[in-house]
Amino acid sequence: MGVIEFLFALAQDMILAAIPAVGFAMVFNVPVRALRWCALLGAIGHGSRMILMTSGLNIEWSTFMASMLVGTIGIQWSRWYLAHPKVFTVAAVIPMFPGISAYTAMISAVKISQLGYSESLMITLLTNFLTASSIVGALSIGLSIPGLWLYRKRPRV
């Protein structure tokens, strides 16, 4: 993939990630003045995950690093705009949730219950379930680490 194609794919990924970020921000009753920042943060998070995955990192570590970036930027923006960091960060990480792998794991579980045990279905179930669980764990831990680092009151040593 050339540089121009990558930049177009990145722009498309960021624009398409901003839409559900705004949608979930509206569901969570985020103030109207913060909606554009939720969209921008969702685009930054998903775009940074795409850049990390393109550079060779797997999806779990890419999601972890992107959610740490979202958490750090959200804390900084909360100081500037006098809002809680969750106003910006929670809606911004929702586009990174593992819908496809969770859905595939669920479908494999349903097929196992209908058709009986099959080694290939069980491998599909476990692989996708572990991937989805790892991504959700990476999102939650990565989103909470910047707050633990930046709001720490005691000395680090």
UniProtKB/Swiss-Prot annotation:
GO cellular component, one term: plasma membrane
One GO-annotated biological process of the protein: succinate transport
Any matching Pfam family: ThrE_2
Membrane topology of the entry: Multi-pass membrane protein
Places the protein is found: Cell inner membrane
Disulfide bridge partners, by residue number: none
Task performed by this protein: Involved in succinate export with YjjP. Both proteins are required for export.
Family: Belongs to the ThrE exporter (TC 2.A.79) family.
Protein name: Probable succinate transporter subunit YjjB
Gene it is expressed from: yjjB
